[in-house]
Every structure is written in structure tokens, then in C-alpha cells.
Amino acid sequence: DPFGNHVARLVFPEKMTSLSIEVELIAPMTVINPFDFFVEEYAEQFPFDYRDELKKELAPYLETPKAGPKLAGWIGKVDREERSITDFLVSLNQRLANEIQYMIRMEPGVQTPEQTLTLGSGSCRDSAWLLVHICRHLGLAARFVSGYLIQLTADVKALDGPSGTETDFTDLHAWTEVFVPGAGWIGLDPTSGLLAGEGHLPLAATAEPASAAPISGATEPCEVTFSFNMSVTRVHEDPRVTKPYTEDQWAEILALGEQVDAQLQALDVRLTMGGEPTFVSIDDMDAPEWTIAAQGPTKRGLSETLLRRLRPHFAPQSLIHYQQGKWYPGEPLPRWALACYWRRDGKPMWQDDRWLADMDRDYGVDDAKALQFAQALTRRLGVSDSHLIPCFEDAYYYLWLERTQPIDVDLRGEDLKDDDNRLRLARLLERGLDATVGYTLPLAATQGGWLSGSWPLRREQLYLVPGDSPMGLRLPLSALPIARREEPQPTSLFEEQAPLADLHGEVASRYSAMYAEGEGSLHHVAAGQDWQEQRPELIDCGVIGTALCIEPRDGKLFVFMPPLARLESYLELLASVEHTAAELNLPVCIEGYAPPSDNRIEKFMITPDPGVIEVNIMPAASWPELVRNTETLYEEARLTRLGTEKFMLEGRHTGTGGGNHVTLGGRTPAESPFL
């Protein structure tokens, strides 16, 4: 026909009792970007005028019948302020899709624009013809397109909005194309409000709908029964990120894993396998924090969300621990690290999640609540609260620092640029240099409990090392009396270790025993004594060099755990902290030193790396466990809006750009096949 569409004409000289038409086509369904087009400079902004030579060639598609009152009213509401032609077409298409309800209409022919607007509904061909009229009245060349729409079920359910069809299907469809200089004919589907993509297969594009009808003609009067059927069959599929294997291939992989597992068990090879997969943001993968920077505005929040999603699967009643991560040259502060610890025997390390604070919430914790918590904790530990030391920022240092700043910098205003020192100083000045930062409790573990004591200092108060890290990392330990003491030796990982006791129960019963029946005063074997009197042999100069810190920060209460050599001591202190939190109805965040390395506990961690976050997943001792860990991790990461793919500048598909290491070993060093 004049539009270049192929037309077949069939003439039947004799009467026929049936007519069957079968259409078969093979369509590559490679995903395309419908916005990937070039626009001539003069047409980048709407409205624009076609050049004279184009107007002649586009004359049939610019023909504008007189608009009825409904159509004129609809067009009159179109915002014609200058803007990007792409944005204009998208908004026009979406407005029509929202205002015209789609309906299946089996009657022949196409509704007029007036009918469609009056009814507020129509079939795909009715909406397409209406959009053709609207575009032409706005000075845009438009044509009617008839063809097929193929929709395939998604490999992965969508995180936002509907996931699309549950089964593959195809149907006859109609949509509109608008001619944009440079880009050519751009498909707009007013039924869905989307641009035409790889699933829109055009068979005919014409100035009038009648010319694009798939079948037209006549028969003599007769009784007709009509039926149709359309189906889609996937002939070939390439492996892709969302579906790398067929079901048969995946079954073979699982079977092979079981076979290897059986051989390892038969030979008593106690191999474990973990990993360090990396992830990037699905929404903003081009931001510096997801390309080159180790830290950024969203990385920690997404990591905390992922950790809380993984925790119920891997380690319910586990400890969430916030700790210092790696520190590389050129970075102003150490990186953060989020960790989750749990006991291998299945007993709780942290009993009640109500007492683990949510980092996104402000609990209104102030200095008074921090002191109340610290005093209650000392009672549970059986030490005197007289050893609690309030900590302050070093006012003299910050007053000196303030005087060294340029005279034109307003430290209490917005003129801070990106200078870390100035930002830190401004925050401190706003809070007040005389405010208590938190409380420190010198603390050491003994076989029978806990010991505390005072810290002799040259200055009357304890002033923290300048900085903005947690106060536990800024204690002036170098100002304490020099002692010749042996560092506590960690438990050897090659030793046989006794099972862990129920330390939560022990802490609760010991605390109850400290109080005489009906009395409110504390009774303890060490009551009224400093720890130096109890264990003078521990430290030469009589000063404990480790401490627990309690700090109100950002409306939450942070407990900084001291370094402890034995896991039992760490768990006992942790249980005391939780019982205190429950007693005061005050959730806490646990930070500071991690539990000592021990074969009786397990962990996974999430840390930042340049351009990615890295998940240090715990080792698995069997193939089914490894499959479960891997599938759970990647699914929960996706639901957190973290993915494993990026695109290079020219569009090439690539991975995260971070390492994806595999770690091999054993449950204990003695069981490692390599050692």
C-alpha cells in the first residue's frame, strides 16, 4: 500500500464454508531502551515547528479534522509551556492513560475522539486514534499503528508496583506513533501510558485506522461463528542475570553439589565455605558511593536494613554489634562495620529484640538517662558506682581550634564548606563544651566476677581525645600511670572448649542473690572494698587499663564494650547490659570491642568498600547449608534494593566492580583441611 505495508488480497470464486488464517512469526525479545534516541536541536523543546520539507512529507500525518467540544476542551487543558519534547510526550501519554479506562470492545470499527472522551473508556484502538487527534491538534505528526503486543512473565517479581503478567501472552494491539525530528517515529501506548518497547510488534502504520485493519473485505449474507486464539512459545533463551540457568541446569548443579558433599563426608574432609559477595544500589548505582567511594549518604542505612533482614534467617536472638572497620590512608575516619554474632549451641546471645535500639529512631536519651543506666549496670556487676567517671570534650583544645579558624568563617552558621574539622567544631559548639559526653567505668573481669577502680589523672576531669568517634575510642589511656602488666592472653582456638552456660540465667540469679530478702541495700562479697584490695596482683600500679563506656548519642544510648580475653566474660557482661536495659525499659546500641574469637560463636558482617558493600557471610559446612545461605542472602539483598550488576558508560553490562571472594577452611583451625 502507499505506506509500504505488505498487503495480501484473497478472492474466492467459489463458496467456502470456513476461513482460517494462521500467523506465525519469530520475534527477538531483547530488551530495548525506548528513550534511546537522538533529537534534532530545534525539536528538543516543545512546542516546535517542522521544517518545510518535512511538513510536505508528513502532510497525511498532520491532517487535522475539526475538533469537537470534548476534544477541544481536553486539548485546552494541555500545558504548552516550553519543556523537553520527551517529557511532554510522556506526560501527554500518561494523562490519557489515566483518564480513559481500557475495555475490550469486540464491535468492528473505531470510536470517534468525541465518543471516547464522552464515554471515558475505549479499546486500545480507540485510545490510539484519540491520541493521534490530540497530537495533530498540538502540531505533532502522528499515525495509527496496528500490530501485536507480547508480554512475557518477569524472571523476578518487581520491587515497585505490579510485576506484570503471570503467564506469557500475546494479543492484537494498537498504539500511536509521533514523528520527532532526529528520533523518527516514537511509539506511545495510551492504553498503558508507556512508550512502545520490544513487546510492541508493528504490522501496519497508517494515517487512518481503516488502512491499518488486519483484515478488511466483504462476504455475502451468511451465518458466521467466529473464534480466535493466540499463544507465545519461547524458542530460545540466553542466560541472563535474572535467569542464568534453566530449571534442568539448576537441578543438575544441585545434584552435583550433593555428590561432592557425599564424597567429602565419606573421606571425613571437614571443609567449610563462606564468601564475601559485594552489592550496589539498584536505584543509584552511578553515585560516587557506588562507583569509587567507600562511604556515602545511603550505604550505611541500606547495610543496616540488610543486616536486620538477614538476622531472622541466620541468627535469631543474636547480637547486633557496631564496630570500627578498616582505616585506609587518606580517609578522615575509620570505616564502620556492622556485625551479627550468635551462639552455635542455639542459645540466645541477646534474648529480647526490644532492648536492641533501632538506629533510625530517636529515643530521647539524655545525660540523666545515661547516668541512670550506668548506675543500674554497676549494681548488676557488683561494683561501686563511685568509680563511674563523667567524660568531657577538651574545652581548651577546642577554644584554641576556634581561634585558629579564618575570621570570615561563621562556625555557628552555614559557612562551613566541606572542612571536617570545622564541621566537628561547629557541632561541639552547638552542644556546648561543658556538656557531659558520657560515662566511663574502669572494668576488668575476674574468675569470680568484675572489678573496678578509679583512674588517677593530672587534670580534675576526664577529657576525651579530640575527635568525633565514639568516646570509647577516644579515652586518654596514655594519661594513665604506666604499668608493667601482661596483656590478657586470648583463648587458643586449638583448645577443647567446654560448652557455654546459660549466662542470662546466671546473671539474673546472681543479681537476685546480691540483695537480702526485703532489704534494699547491696550485699556483695566485695562490698566496701576497692578492687586493688581484692586482687592486688593483677596490675602493678593499681590501675585498670580497660573500661566500659556509656554514651548518649543522637537520641540513643550506646554501650561501648571493653576488650575481654574470654568469651564467657563478654557474654556475662552483655547479659548484664540487656538485663539493665530491660529493667529501665531503655533500648541500647552495642558498640566497641567485638566478642573474642571463639569456636563456640558464629558471625556475619557487612562492611563498606570502594563502590560497594561487602557481606562477609559465615562459613557453611554442607552443600544444602551453602545453597540456603547464598539464596537467602541474594534474595534479601534484592528486597533491600541492592543488586549485583552495573552498566558501564557505553551501556555494557558488568558486575558490581567489587571483589566476590570465596573463603575456604574448617569449623575450627584443627579441622581445617588446609592446616
Residue ranges and their predicted role:
Residues 29, 80-81, 563-567, 618-623, ...:
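A generic structural motif
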Residues 554-561, 606-619, 660-666:
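Short, hydrophobic beta-strand segments
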Residues 186-197, 622-636, 666-675:
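Helical (often loop-to-helix) elements that flank the catalytic cores of nucleotide-handling enzymes
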Residues 1-122, 137-602, 607:
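Mixed-charge, low-complexity segments
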Residues 24, 93, 132, 173, ...:
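Short, well-ordered alpha-helical packing segments
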Residues 431-446, 458, 595-600, 632, ...:
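Metal-dependent DNA replication initiation modules
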Residues 2, 8-13, 614-638:
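Aromatic/His-enriched, Gly/Pro-containing loop or helix-boundary segments
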Residues 146, 561, 590-594, 617-619, ...:
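Glycine-rich, histidine-containing beta strand-loop boundary motifs that form or position
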